[in-house]
């Protein structure tokens, strides 16, 4: 079946609001096995919306319209639809997260679905009510499996699986950049559930073979920080963190995981050079010669926190998150991350792009990825050495 997505709102046209709804709906269509050839944004104008709907119904079986459903003067979607589909059967979608309900209009073979503009309202409404409704409209069973990777870029993943990513292929493979992580989603269509599941298995096996240690989970619900905590627990390790530019975000991600008290010892934020010297024992000469944003300082930070807390594993982060302070030699987005696993120290250099918040978030993901990599490599070497 063919789906078309229409997003309504002047704020989308002016760039005041980013259109995350269209991305979400398009992704859900992939899960359903539907094809989406057009996505359109239209302002709060009834005649333009009606014109767009009439065009969409000529080329799509299902039209997903989001936005313009509230009580404000510029919420014109429902009235526009009523005038075009005055004889359609109407099914109401209850909004459990807001005031404005959604609607499904059934007009012969066409389905027009109206959804609120707020993502907090749209996403649960679609997932809980619209997705099951649409699933019944197809005789195909759709099953998906998500493989989550870290410590690798989306381009590197795509380059490695070009031969597997044929759009006409079943199962269908798609990659998604998730702020430093890469998620690979495998979607299979079949007439029976067992057949769809069977089709996915060899693809997942091949992905595991190609990416090996970069894959941290094949379960949708498992986060990167959860996988790190599980790894620490499995190896009976305690961890401490020392952060500068990330300001405690790494510790916060770890502490979000239930049961982390079994492995997490201490988290420090040493933003100033003075704090780095006083708390960690970073040398004044090192700071003067290399500056706080350097591999040398990241190394002394991670060694200092190891001595201070006696943790088995320690991680340090220092960098330039911007927007100011960058130079040609040390630009904004330059980050050094150190990891010490039982005395084996590794320091990596990273270059991130984006605003201050995005750079810090990417740095945290990189720190978790490096933590995981270093622990795995340490124990693989220990195991090999014991053979």
Locations of regions flagged by a protein language model:
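Glycine-rich phosphate/diphosphate-binding loop of Rossmann-like nucleotide-binding domains
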Residues: 1-39, 197-198
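Conserved hydrophobic helix-helix packing surfaces used for dimerization/oligomerization
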Residues: 3-5, 112, 239
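Glycine-rich beta-strand-to-loop/alpha-helix junction loops that act as flexible
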Residues: 8-10, 65-73, 116, 189-190, ...
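N-terminal small/polar loop signature for handling phosphorylated ligands or for N-terminal nucleophile
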Residues: 23-84, 88-89, 295-310
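Proline/glycine-rich low-complexity loops and linkers
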Residues: 48-51, 58, 72-137
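Accessory alpha-helical/coil subdomains and C-terminal extensions
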Residues: 107, 114-187, 192-200
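Short alpha-helical segments enriched in small residues
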Residues: 195-201, 207-387
């Amino acid at each position: 079946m063919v789906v078309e997505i229409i997003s309504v709102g002047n704020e989308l046209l002016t760039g005041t609001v980013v259109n995350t709804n269209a991305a979400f709906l398009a992704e859900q269509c992939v899960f359903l096995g539907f094809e989406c050839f057009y996505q359109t944004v239209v302002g709060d104008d009834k005649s333009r919306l009606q014109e767009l709907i009439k065009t969409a119904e000529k080329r799509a079986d299902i039209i997903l319209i989001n936005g313009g459903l509230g009580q404000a003067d510029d919420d014109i979607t429902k009235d526009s639809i009523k005038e075009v589909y005055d004889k359609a059967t109407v099914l109401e979608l209850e909004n459990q997260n807001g005031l404005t309900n959604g609607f499904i209009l059934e007009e012969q073979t066409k389905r027009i679905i109206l959804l609120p503009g707020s993502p907090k309202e749209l996403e649960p409404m679609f997932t809980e009510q619209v997705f099951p409704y649409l699933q019944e409209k197809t005789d195909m069973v759709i099953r998906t499996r998500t493989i989550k990777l870290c410590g690798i870029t989306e381009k590197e993943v795509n380059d490695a699986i070009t031969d597997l990513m044929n759009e006409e292929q079943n199962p269908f493979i798609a990659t998604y950049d998730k702020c430093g992580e890469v998620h690979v989603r495998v979607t299979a269509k079949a007439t029976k559930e067992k057949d769809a599941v069977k089709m996915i298995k060899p693809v997942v096996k091949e992905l595991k073979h190609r990416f090996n240690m970069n894959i941290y989970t094949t379960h949708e619900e498992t986060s990167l920080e959860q996988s790190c905590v599980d790894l620490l627990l499995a190896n009976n390790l305690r961890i401490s963190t020392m952060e500068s530019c990330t300001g405690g975000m790494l510790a916060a991600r770890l502490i979000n995981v239930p049961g982390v008290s079994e492995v997490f010892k201490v988290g420090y934020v040493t933003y100033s050079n003075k704090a780095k010297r006083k708390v960690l024992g970073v040398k004044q000469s090192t700071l003067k010669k290399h500056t706080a944003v350097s591999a040398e300082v990241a190394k002394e930070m991670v060694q200092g926190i190891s001595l201070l807390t006696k943790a088995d594993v320690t991680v340090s982060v220092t960098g330039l998150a911007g927007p100011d302070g960058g130079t040609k030699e040390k630009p904004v987005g330059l980050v050094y991350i150190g990891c010490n696993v039982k005395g084996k120290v590794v320091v990596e250099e990273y270059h991130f792009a984006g605003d201050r918040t995005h750079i810090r978030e990417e740095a945290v993901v990189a720190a978790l990825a490096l933590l995981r990599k270093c622990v795995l490599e340490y124990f693989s070497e220990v195991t090999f050495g014991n053979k």
